[in-house]
């Protein structure tokens, strides 16, 4: 079996043991040359994970993944453990249910996301949700060479703002919107069990269950992808141009006051797109409601080459988002709750990166539901998906020192004050999912073929019109 060379610092060595390095290792290349056909995904992904976990367990004590793989291997042909060949064929013959168990082990081992070393390593050779659109457009040029994850963000910048406010939005969704529904707020890296080339990490999912260290998704599970809008962060001051429009929204929550609030900045987050026209790629929320048509902007017609956009627009145009306007803690003894609810015709932009993020989350969570017993017979195994847009203001001297969400959930003193949350359901047509994944998988395959002498083949099920792969 492929071993990682021993160095003084095993953690440092582990961080360099990527999927690309595994494919280029002499032992892997020798094993592949002795096969009667090219190795296949996702089996090769799981062989790599076995080799990686074998090294990790020496100092982590986590043996679950390797033990489960060993139970799938028919023969132990070496006193030092099973060979790559035995491991590969055991995993090649594994069922989707067994592969989902392996993926659940990986998810449980990688919680903590950017703070987890293994989470960073596993991105190598994976088309993640944030890379799906760029892979379709430009090819997976960075998939096998992902940029290192940075955790050193300027406190006053948009990335740090989003990170520190995300937990507050999770609290609002779980406690105030969903009414304490069973939820999981901490996810590791979720690799697709059916292909081994796609992977996601979720922000929040409600209606999930726990089975030991594993998360069990069900046909009632609902994904929430959270976006905290830094460009709408404002001060409670008459000199802030956003504040007057927020005041109008707070005093009279309605569609008209919300339109004014959204359009209080130069590049608003909601774009008006009439039927039959092509949206821009500028931001991720659209509307066809004429009340939002405040500027005469010419837009191209939908035409040849826009079939997927047209199908996605048709599926989402009737979506109704729900705006939750929050109470002001300075008027409620520090308590933040839901002041009012306003339904609005706002839906996701299928040309924006966030659409592709939730598409891949929907696909992979659906895989887990189907292959882990989380779906009931006769029911659709697909999860529901929402994108959450959260708006905040800076703290004011008038705000109490202690603020709570609801009556008892403390709001961290370092976090800004939430003023509104917009929940937008997302509809993902099957035809769009199939074509998107087929294009991305074909791009991954072509890049791997040109990069590695031992490139594994991608499952043919990912190719809608191509049976050239086994």
UniProtKB/Swiss-Prot annotation:
Cell compartment(s), UniProt: Host nucleus; Host cytoplasm
Keyword annotations: Decay of host mRNAs by virus, Early protein, Endonuclease, Eukaryotic host gene expression shutoff by virus, Exonuclease, Host cytoplasm, Host gene expression shutoff by virus, Host mRNA suppression by virus, Host nucleus, Host-virus interaction, Hydrolase, Nuclease, RNA-binding
EC number: 3.1.-.-
Predominant subcellular localization, coarse grouping: host cell
BP GO terms, sorted: symbiont-mediated degradation of host mRNA; symbiont-mediated suppression of host antigen processing and presentation; symbiont-mediated suppression of host gene expression
Pfam family, any one: Viral_alk_exo
GO cellular component, one term: host cell nucleus
GO molecular function, one term: DNA binding
HAMAP family: HSV_AN (MF_04009)
Family: Belongs to the herpesviridae alkaline nuclease family.
Protein name: Shutoff alkaline exonuclease
The organism of origin for this protein: Epstein-Barr virus (strain B95-8) (HHV-4)
């Amino acid at each position: 079996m492929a071993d990682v060379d021993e160095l003084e610092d095993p953690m440092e060595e582990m961080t360099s043991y990527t999927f690309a390095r595994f494919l280029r290792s002499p032992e892997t290349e020798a094993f592949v040359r002795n096969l009667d056909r090219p190795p296949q995904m996702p089996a090769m992904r799981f062989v790599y994970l076995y080799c990686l976990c074998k090294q990790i367990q020496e100092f982590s004590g986590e043996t679950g993944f390797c033990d489960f793989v060993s139970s799938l291997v028919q023969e132990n042909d070496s006193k030092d453990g099973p060979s790559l060949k035995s491991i590969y064929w055991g995993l090649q013959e594994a069922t989707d249910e067994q592969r989902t168990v392996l993926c659940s082990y990986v998810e449980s081992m990688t919680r903590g996301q950017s703070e987890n070393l293994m989470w960073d390593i596993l991105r190598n050779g994976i088309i993640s949700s944030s890379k799906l659109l760029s892979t379709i457009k430009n090819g997976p040029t960075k998939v096998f060479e992902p940029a290192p994850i940075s955790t050193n963000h300027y406190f006053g910048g948009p990335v740090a703002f989003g990170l520190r406010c995300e937990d507050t939005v999770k609290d609002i969704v779980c406690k105030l919107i969903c009414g304490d529904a069973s939820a999981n707020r901490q996810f590791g890296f979720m690799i697709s069990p059916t292909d081994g080339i796609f992977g996601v990490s979720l922000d929040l999912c409600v209606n999930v269950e726990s089975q030991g260290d594993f998360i069990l998704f069900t046909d009632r599970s609902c994904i929430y992808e959270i976006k905290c809008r830094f460009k709408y962060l404002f001060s409670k001051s008459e000199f802030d141009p956003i504040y007057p429009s927020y005041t109008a929204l707070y005093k009279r929550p309605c569609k008209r006051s919300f339109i004014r609030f959204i359009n209080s900045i130069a590049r608003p987050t909601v774009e008006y797109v009439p039927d039959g026209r092509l949206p821009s790629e500028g931001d991720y929320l659209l509307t066809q409601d004429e009340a939002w048509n405040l500027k005469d902007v010419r837009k191209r017609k939908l035409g040849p080459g826009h079939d997927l956009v047209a199908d996605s627009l048709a599926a989402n145009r009737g979506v109704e988002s729900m705006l939750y306007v929050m109470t002001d803690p300075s008027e409620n003894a520090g308590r933040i709750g839901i002041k009012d609810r306003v339904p609005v015709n706002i839906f996701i932009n299928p040309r924006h990166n966030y659409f592709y993020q939730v598409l891949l989350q929907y696909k992979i969570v659906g895989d887990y539901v189907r292959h882990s017993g989380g779906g009931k017979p006769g029911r659709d195994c697909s999860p529901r998906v929402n994108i959450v847009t959260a708006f905040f203001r800076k703290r004011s001297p008038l705000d109490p020192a202690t603020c709570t969400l609801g009556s008892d959930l403390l709001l961290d003193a370092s976090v800004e004050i939430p003023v509104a949350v917009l929940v937008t359901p997302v509809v993902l047509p099957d035809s769009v999912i199939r074509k998107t994944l087929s294009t991305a998988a074909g791009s991954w395959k072509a890049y791997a073929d040109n990069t590695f002498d031992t490139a594994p083949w991608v499952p043919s099920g990912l190719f809608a019109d191509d049976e050239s792969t086994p």
